Amino acid sequence: MTMKLQFDHSKKFQLDAIESTVKLFEGQQKFDASFVDFVDGVVPNKLTINENEIFENLKDIQKQNKIPISESFEGMNFSIEMETGTGKTYVYLRTIYELNKKYGFKKFIIVVPSVAIREGTKKNFEITKDDFQILYNKIPIQSTEYSSKNISYIRQFSNSNKIEVMIITRDSFNKDVNIMNTPQDKFYGK
């Protein structure tokens, strides 16, 4: 007999964090899942709003959450900060489903600081997957750990019409960034 964890879907502080992230893209058109960039067969996350609109959304979210308002836009780098043990991993995994539901986003890269955190993230993904499948009507989702030894996975990641989540450590990203941008025979020269 296997033990199944029960998740509380109604913790206000978690829902507030998820909603804040989703609101960053307020005004974004929902991406049509049938659209594919036929030149390369890529299924992208295509933004229909610009950085100025995202910056205005950011300031609204900061005001709503009573945190200091940014004076300038410093790029598309956002963080949700929560205390240890409050469900950060649950929040960002559920945020993936919400961003897909509201905007049709399908490509996500989770960059973690260490191998231990990567392994914990993979385990959390497995533990929560069945629960999220019930909550989000069995939306197809695939999670894979990035490995420079399996560079062809990046092509699969970009071509898939499912929600794709790539989990990578910060060190792998920094070390392998040149590999990602270098033509590879295994990667069909792209």
Q: What are these language model-derived features?
A:
Residues 1-190:
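RecA-like P-loop NTPase motor core of helicase/translocase proteins
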